[in-house]
């Protein structure tokens, strides 16, 4: 089974950045978000994971930059939009901008009834981001705790969630390898598809994730590993085939 790869473009204050463990203030600046996204599209990406960090942290938004990327590149690549989607207005804006899929994080924990209604309405165009420390969920830009992972999944499964984007916060941006055990535990407890996020630092990490395909891990988000040139997207796509 092949693995779908989603190069990440995280946007803060109008720039493409990478964070360490999701912490505000730990940014490394990588320049223009549009140029970053275009680089990955030209290198063969079929999906882009586009994150508005300001919206996630409640420090504003980067809608203009995100809209430019979706408008200019949306006919060449599928875009998964994440960050600050927690009500009808922000969800509608993301979908109307042309996102193929929208990733809901904090709202899934703070407003389960709303989350259930949008999963029912939009189906597989809505994924739920599970940002995890141990077996505890992190909420609102990873600054607060949001409850037990598996209890939350039980509810989300019951309302028909079709995809989880699973991030081990301790691994994210640290180039220390993905949490294969966590990914396995999540995938084995749900019929939903699972996207792996956080910690991928070498091609062998992708090979390890690919081995989980038969239990439902069908995709992986690539962030710092690409920006730090640990490997090229072309090399990763070859492994993912």
Swiss-Prot record:
Listed as disulfide-bonded, the cysteine pairs are none
Q: Which domain of life is it from?
A: Bacteria
Q: Name one GO biological process term.
A: L-histidine biosynthetic process
Gene Ontology cellular component annotations, sorted alphabetically: cytoplasm
* PANTHER family hit by this protein: 1-(5-PHOSPHORIBOSYL)-5-[(5-PHOSPHORIBOSYLAMINO)METHYLIDENEAMINO] IMIDAZOLE-4-CARBOXAMIDE ISOMERASE (PTHR43090:SF2)
A GO MF term:
phosphoribosylanthranilate isomerase activity
Q: What is its EC number?
A: 5.3.1.16
Listed HAMAP family = HisA
User: Main EC class of this protein?
Assistant: isomerase
**UniProt record similarity statement:** Belongs to the HisA/HisF family.
Instruction: List the catalytic residues.
Output: 10 (proton acceptor), 131 (proton donor)
Q: Where in the cell is it found?
A: Cytoplasm
Q: In which pathway does it act?
A: Amino-acid biosynthesis; L-histidine biosynthesis; L-histidine from 5-phospho-alpha-D-ribose 1-diphosphate: step 4/9
What does the UniProt keyword field contain? Amino-acid biosynthesis, Cytoplasm, Histidine biosynthesis, Isomerase
- Gene (name only): hisA
**Is the keyword Transmembrane helix assigned to this protein?**
no
Protein name in the entry = 1-(5-phosphoribosyl)-5-[(5-phosphoribosylamino)methylideneamino] imidazole-4-carboxamide isomerase
Entry's CDD domains? HisA
Q: Does this entry carry the keyword Membrane?
A: no
């Amino acid at each position: 089974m092949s693995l779908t790869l989603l190069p990440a473009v995280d946007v803060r204050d109008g720039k493409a950045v990478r964070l360490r463990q999701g912490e505000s203030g730990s940014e490394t600046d990588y320049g223009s978000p549009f140029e970053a996204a275009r680089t990955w599209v030209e290198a063969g990406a079929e999906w882009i994971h586009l994150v508005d960090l300001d919206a996630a942290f409640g420090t504003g938004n980067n809608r203009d930059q995100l809209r430019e990327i979706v408008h200019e590149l949306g006919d060449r690549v599928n875009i998964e939009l994440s960050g600050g989607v927690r009500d009808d207005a922000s969800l509608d804006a993301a979908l109307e901008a042309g996102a193929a899929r929208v990733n809901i994080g904090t709202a899934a924990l703070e407003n389960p009834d709303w989350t259930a209604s949008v999963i029912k309405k939009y189906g597989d165009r809505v994924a739920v981001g599970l940002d995890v420390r141990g077996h505890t969920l992190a909420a609102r830009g990873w600054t607060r705790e949001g409850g037990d992972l598996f209890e939350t999944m039980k509810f989300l499964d019951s309302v028909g969630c079709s995809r989880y984007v699973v991030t081990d916060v301790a691994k994210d941006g640290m180039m220390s390898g993905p949490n294969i055990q966590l990914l396995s535990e999540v995938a084995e407890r749900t019929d939903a598809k699972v996207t792996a996020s956080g910690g991928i630092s070498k091609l062998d990490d992708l090979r390890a994730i690919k081995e989980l395909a038969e239990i439902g891990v069908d995709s992986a988000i690539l962030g710092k590993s690409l920006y730090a040139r640990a490997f090229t997207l072309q090399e990763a796509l070859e492994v993912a085939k």
